[in-house]
Amino acid sequence: MAAASNGSEYFEFDVETGRESFARPSNAETVEQDEEDLRWAAIGRLPSQRQGTHNAILRRSQTQTQTSGYADGNVVQTIDVKKLDRADREMLVRQALATSDQDNFKLLSAIKERLDRVGMEVPKIEVRFENLNIEADVQAGTRALPTLVNVSRDFFERCLSSLRIIKPRKHKLNILKDISGIIKPGRMTLLLGPPGSGKSTLLLALAGKLDKSLKKTGNITYNGENLNKFHVKRTSAYISQTDNHIAELTVRETLDFAARCQGASEGFAGYMKDLTRLEKERGIRPSSEIDAFMKAASVKGEKHSVSTDYVLKVLGLDVCSDTMVGNDMMRGVSGGQRKRVTTGEMTVGPRKTLFMDEISTGLDSSTTFQIVKCIRNFVHLMDATVLMALLQPAPETFDLFDDLILLSEGYMVYQGPREDVIAFFESLGFRLPPRKGVADFLQEVTSKKDQAQYWADPSKPYQFIPVSDIAAAFRNSKYGHAADSKLAAPFDKKSADPSALCRTKFAISGWENLKVCFVRELLLIKRHKFLYTFRTCQVGFVGLVTATVFLKTRLHPTSEQFGNEYLSCLFFGLVHMMFNGFSELPLMISRLPVFYKQRDNSFHPAWSWSIASWLLRVPYSVLEAVVWSGVVYFTVGLAPSAGRFFRYMLLLFSVHQMALGLFRMMASLARDMVIANTFGSAAILIVFLLGGFVIPKADIKPWWVWGFWVSPLSYGQRAIAVNEFTATRWMTPSAISDTTIGLNLLKLRSFPTNDYWYWIGIAVLIGYAILFNNVVTLALAYLNPLRKARAVVLDDPNEETALVADANQVISEKKGMILPFKPLTMTFHNVNYYVDMPKEMRSQGVPETRLQLLSNVSGVFSPGVLTALVGSSGAGKTTLMDVLAGRKTGGYTEGDIRISGHPKEQQTFARISGYVEQNDIHSPQVTVEESLWFSASLRLPKEITKEQKKEFVEQVMRLVELDTLRYALVGLPGTTGLSTEQRKRLTIAVELVANPSIIFMDEPTSGLDARAAAIVMRTVRNTVDTGRTVVCTIHQPSIDIFEAFDELLLMKRGGQVIYGGKLGTHSQVLVDYFQGINGVPPISSGYNPATWMLEVTTPALEEKYNMEFADLYKKSDQFREVEANIKQLSVPPEGSEPISFTSRYSQNQLSQFLLCLWKQNLVYWRSPEYNLVRLVFTTIAAFILGTVFWDIGSKRTSSQDLITVMGALYSACLFLGVSNASSVQPIVSIERTVFYREKAAGMYAPIPYAAAQGLVEIPYILTQTILYGVITYFTIGFERTFSKFVLYLVFMFLTFTYFTFYGMMAVGLTPNQHLAAVISSAFYSLWNLLSGFLVQKPLIPVWWIWFYYICPVAWTLQGVILSQLGDVESMINEPLFHGTVKEFIEYYFGYKPNMIGVSAAVLVGFCALFFSAFALSVKYLNFQRR
């Protein structure tokens, strides 16, 4: 026996010994039994205390002996389940599942059988809801649009209504209306209903996660107990529709974290001891594979869990377990895989009550079937309680459920066994047509537009039956009575297992929680390595600049003037450390959505995350302080003593910690990028102004002195000054006073002179860091995310008329789509597409440099023919569409693509084609009608009149049934505005209004319920019938959707085609082709051909029958027919010309600019969180500056007064400017994703778009300038002459403009907002240092003076100071200077009197430069990776 490195032990049995010990006849069953005996013999040899944590597994060798069935040299190995490596965990799961398919039936059956043999029962939960009503208060009509005026009105109305002065004017919206029901353990319940029926609200209410603003009445119980009696958030899980994950973690890391936090081991750990004890007592020997799995799954506190491997396998995520999850801007797993990660994250734990909200979005029907089947096995065998809402369940998926709840318009229309639902509707007079899925029928039968087609009672004429009547009929039917009688019987609490409901808030201890969060944060810091390295290099770089500006050869401790320069250097170090923390803000806010989701599911307490991230910032602060001190301290020549050097370093560390705490606090309180940026700037403004450097304490107004004592920077400033100026080298007697230079300087600037102020400074700064981080923890614990989803009730005058759809309208719609267009054929032959081999795969030893995603794909798309592109997830459907449409931004494409026989030209192709993307990307602040009008105006030819365009937009809106939503705001996905399916229809409509000849649609029906999918497909079919060429990728086609297609291109993983050609009536051509292949099981009657086709072409089946579907297709008649077709259509018809246009875009540049400006104007007017907040902040900042520097402009008797005025202007420029630059970045960033879609669609050129984006800012900047200018000009007390006031406003306007354009430029030049924030902050530091305030122009060394001239803040200061004080002849009489104010300005600041015009011209130049850089970045840079 030898001990292995991972805590495993080997027992080598040679085969002969094995045969003697267990002599039996040789067949497969006895071999298995022999192996089992060997395993138990190995376990039996272990000491008894180790038998609970060890298990025996059989390591199978490659060769299997024919005679005995034993492996040559097979090794039975005992492993310690607490020390499993990844290979062991994967092997355990594989052996326990006992199948290569994605199925858990054998494993769960074996576990159930094991428990049944000793008479143990698993805890069960029954969920009941009785008389549940849920109401929301909503704004109606145009008041629901968030314009600047409406938001201001809402704010004042809220204030007045909270003071009981007025009554709130809102409309009540009933989301759920008096519904009752039971969800039983051990039975799978499906929740169906059209969009807006209240499915998500019901799921959230049952999971105890209902938004506090909704009014709930009625009762919800688990096992007869109310929700406040136990921890409902740990007992049940709500699996959300939106996929919120940390993009930089891999799938496995995401699930491992979830498993540890939820205590994945609790599931089995609770009864493993009792189970093994009972088995020993009764002499029962379980299967060793199941025993090994259960033991491993019940191990607590391990970093990696066997539950993760199990969930990865069951959800089919094992293929992408080491891929980053990714997000919209970062490449990661596919949309369908991300949706499964969301499911896996909640199911990896021990929760057995699951409320699953549309978990199949983006999955093909066979994957959905597999997953639902695995969940059904879990429900039936482990007595779990599951309520699952699905949008378009295929018939075979629908049949997996036991019970059904049908909601519509908030009413409960049916609840009971699934098989009785058709009988109930037949009793009302409706009938299910043949070849129609039950789920599709149920979603449409309650709808006003679709109900009539299902009427089947010849005895009476059809009359619309409203939902309320159907709900009443259900309550009075035998099915309703049956449901009521179940509810009437009270739950038997005695039979309930007390351990079924969780009584503690978290699954693991506080220490464990902290460890888990710490490990994850450390991993994320490694993933954000570039950001942190960049920030450290930036500190080094700015430090180097500072060191060379204040070089010690130029500075000597011989006079107060040099002392002032040293003080500027010290102050700048502090301010830089402070600003360096600002980039923590976007990082923190981007992490909040995931944090809130995990907090609300009781993964971990808020403090464990906030402390872990705080602790990991400590080494980072140490590094920053060491780098800065190392570069700056001795180069500048600060007090040469080791003690003072280390004290300097400690002080910088404390300031950095305080700053990180401050910005994290801002982020956790604001919870929104724009608001946080704005109020973050306001906080720094106060801290900075009252820090004791810009204004000495003696000059601070009495009403602001408290601010000086509260400002953390003032303590840092005093400590750093005391540390330097009490050193021995500053003890030379002063020439202008009777003390030493050092003490005189401290007194002049109102600093204390005692050494203990250094230690007070350190203590206060660290105290602030602790305080701020505690506030972060409290904010994370008690505040909820902003921007909750709100239903918006819109007043639509046409609502009633729109619902009456008559035959004439349908006919006119079909005609209405015919604006003139040219039918086109697209052929493509042997298309290949490669990308560079991903690093992860190269690191695993893959030798190739390129990865092939498409392999010799050929086909034809013809006019009037609807083609489906089908394949499992990852088959390359979207890739093929992107390549054909010319949407790929990277990779290598080969092959021949032709349009009506002519080679494809991308620029003209964008004009004649439309591309409906899978992600519905739209500007959030415009309405549905405005989105369509914008697209139509830009993309329809100039020749079409405005009236024709309007009529066309109307017809398209009716066609996709968006006419009742014309005034609805688009909003952000998953939070505000349109629902998923409404957004999808809008995406299609935006392309249809362009009147294209060829339309590509990527997943037009994913994320839609059956009725919405039918509406979309009806739209698509109508479009094709007008003679257009339409191609759709499709995931989950129901029979009717699939059979709406004419032709099919079927792909498999690796981007290979396995079928191309006609579908035939009832898909007969396709079925005949596959049934003609030897080994393919035939299709059963009434089964969905799309589902069957995906099931019979899986890799598992290819392996089983040893065949390659791609090769078989290449040898088939179908393939030869397609090739012949391509050959014939690749030659242009005689006399035909390739498509060409006189210009690249359908509108000229001026029209593009005006339309972009029109849209941007709407976006800005409806962005109160940006524009209203900016104006409010400007007003607050102006009042702060005005009251801090009250009347300082009229004092001109001393140099200190003039320096203070300069300080006021410098602070205002820097802070308001930086605030403008920071808060514009998220707006530009959101609009950029929309721009990428619109640019790819050929809507407009980049320059008109950029011009509109820049120009729309001007009126808001002007308003901001007037607000700021009027307040500060008169409070600071400058001369009240009109010309000086106008000049002041002009300089401020130009300053705010160049800062805003600089912020836009920073986003334009970088791939994401985080990097834009970090890079722009580097320049703020340099502008701060060399703007002429900290180091005046005459004192800037010759090697840096060039930077002074390219620093825009320097020109602002020069312009403003000269415009206000450049002509003042008042005298200054001081020991160091004697002359007029005008002369002092030239002597001290280096400003020449005739430079006002030049300064203004230079600032206009900076505005133009930054704007041009933004425009060029928009034109030439593309950070979208496709």
UniProtKB/Swiss-Prot annotation:
Keyword presence, Transmembrane: yes
SMART domains: AAA
Catalyzed reactions per annotation: abscisate(in) + ATP + H2O = abscisate(out) + ADP + phosphate + H(+)
Topology of this chain in the membrane: Multi-pass membrane protein
Residues where ATP 1 binds: G193, P194, P195, G196, S197, G198, K199, S200
The protein's name: ABC transporter G family member 31
ABC transporter domain span: 160-434, 826-1078
Residues the record marks as carrying a glycan: N6, N150, N219, N856
Species of provenance: Arabidopsis thaliana
